[in-house]
Amino acid sequence: MRILQLYIGGQRVDLFKDESVSLTQTIQNVKDIAKVFTEFTQTFSVPASSVNNKIFKHYYNSNIQGGFDARTKKAAYLELNNTPFKEGKIKLNRVGLKNNVAHTYHITFFGNVVDLKDVLGDDLLSSLATLNEYSQVYDFTNVTNYIQGYAPNTNDNVLVPLITHTDRMIYNGDSNAHEYGNVAVHGGGGNNNGINWYQFKYALRLQAIITAIEEKYTIANGYATDIVFSNDFFNDATNQEFDDLFMWLHRKKGDVESTSFGEATWTTYEGAATTQTFGDYGGMPTLSSFQNGQLTISKSVGDDFTTNSPKVTLTLNPVLTSPLVPYDVRVTGSNGYVLLENTIGGLQTIINGVEPFENGTYSIEIRSDVLLQFAAGGIKWIVEYEFRDEDFITLSGGIRYLNQATFSTSAVREFNITEQIPKMKIIDFLSGLFKLFNLTAYVDNLGVLVVRTLDSYYAANTKAPIVIDEYIDVTKSDVEIALPFKEINFAYKGLGTLLAKQYEQIFNSGWGSTSYTLNNQTYDAPTEDYKVIAPFEHMQFERLYDLDTSASNIGNTTIQYGFFVDDNFESYYGDPLIFYPILNNGTAMKIIDTEVASDVATLTRYFIPSNTLALQCGTSETSIHFQNEISEYLARETGNPNCFIDSIFETKYKTYIQDVFSNRRRLVKVSAILPLKIYYDLELNNLIEINQETYKINSLTTDLTTGKTEFELLNTLIW
């Protein structure tokens, strides 16, 4: 006899004596291959007994204060004959009444993997606050350092790949080919050739996102459970096919837009000045000078200047912005003079020229939270004074000192990770990885979410096949065709960048996509095509070749880049892009800032984006294509550019899928009443033996009160 017990919040629930409670369990169902997080759910009813009314706090009575909150699931577990069986959550759906009296509570029991969706909800990747530990300064120096792998903080979770958001790169070694976008390094071009540094954006290691999920979703942070992933696929630095994957931090098309800047610091104006004199200045001795941004007043005792001389005015007029950028000004003098002014932005008179100025050297400091620029003439000192000459004639005039070059505050522009990471739900990110790598998940006895590839999950079974001949109901069984689909299509959702679109137009197939039927045959099946779609962008990258037609220069470069535009050559939004960054050495390339002539960098090492784990298949044959595609990097080299044969389909899906389409595959349905000792230890990767034939478990549905189990089994095949 089997006794089922349900506990909610540690309290045992009364059950109907004749209630049939069954659970369906499956890891991967042949009928729905792309479905992930497949732990069971089961709805059943319990009586409105005094015990249950206490547990559910008479939910039918809405007048009760502090009653049962049915908006959230509650911790629960099942026991069979006082032995723990399954942990999960319950949700109260409704209360059934008879003659206006509570009679039945209708509840649903959820397995722990299903609960993952409830914990994550609709949270976006941008909600993972700890990712901001990887935020970086966004400027010429930092970007060029991170392109070369010179991370100042030795952080290898962030880098900058050669992916441009708008502008095309070419390579033309002709010394006369001075044009923007040509990254070849040769003399005489200055900043006329090269690519702007702000065409590039940072990228983040996918494992860092997994870690951030674990750090956020904890009981200590107020969540219902700790999300902890095993180290079977995630959290394993030796698993290069995942650990080396990065996501391009591209939140919007085109330039980086950020509201985040580093802490505002004072910036001292130290530039030279243009002078303008007025009035009788030429007939008077000087009492002021200007050097390295500092104004010096030097009026000697006995000089025939009037007592109210000099009068000094300071005006600041930054480059117009909308809205205005507030800024602070601090004027300090060697004589102890200090003036601090907080402004709302725009044109401001800081010193009004009313009181005479004392001797001393005065300097200006300005700070703002956002980068602020003062064009030439935007910082202006006016020194005005009167002088009596030897004929006692009063002369008046003065001099203006205007900044000669543009001055900028030193607010540091920050590339904030949570502001720049693509807009994507965390659950969609995880589901996408599960679909891409054919992963499966279950919760172990320690509450760890074990994540493995399906093949490794089945391979982990070390038990001998479980023989159930003596327990099955021989009066009825079915053997069905196991072919659920005509064909299965594997593709990335995002195939909208220029070269990927061109590939589709030429070959009538998606870049990196594949369709599978055994031996490319078309079969009759009860349903149409089945689609496995990974919700990421998949680019075709471009290796640069020297456009110089002179014989000595024709050939490959070591530069490969991504041109993230659509087929109209316009900036493209797309889906979250994942790729392998490979640090390559060789051909020199130039990165510039067309607005700052001194910002020029020559790079001979750089992170190039790739769809393969390595550039040479002798190192690794792994790719993130669903099918074997030609290597963009090896396309024009001698040898076989199709040598990256370890595609996603080949290594993650083929073993399972080719069995599905085999003429020898059968779906066998049998019933059995298993002893508890077998049922307790039964795992979904165990093999079942019937009549000396072995089977994989497709699904099993068990009536927990009677012990009757309905098996769907797939016969094992040897290829």
Locate each region found by the language model:
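Solvent-exposed serine/threonine-rich low-complexity stretches and specific carbohydrate-binding patches
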Residues: N335-Q348
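Polar, S/T/G-rich
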Residues: M1-T277, I379-R413, T418-L436, S456-A464, ...
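Exposed aromatic-hydrophobic patches
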Residues: S298, G346-E355
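Noncatalytic modules at the cell exterior or secretory-pathway interfaces
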Residues: G353-Q373
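Short, well-ordered loop/turn sites that connect or cap secondary structure elements
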Residues: A70, F357, D681-L682
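Terminal (often C-terminal
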Residues: E257-S322, V329, G333-S334, A376, ...
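Short beta-strand-centered aromatic/proline hotspots
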Residues: K86-V95, E693-D703
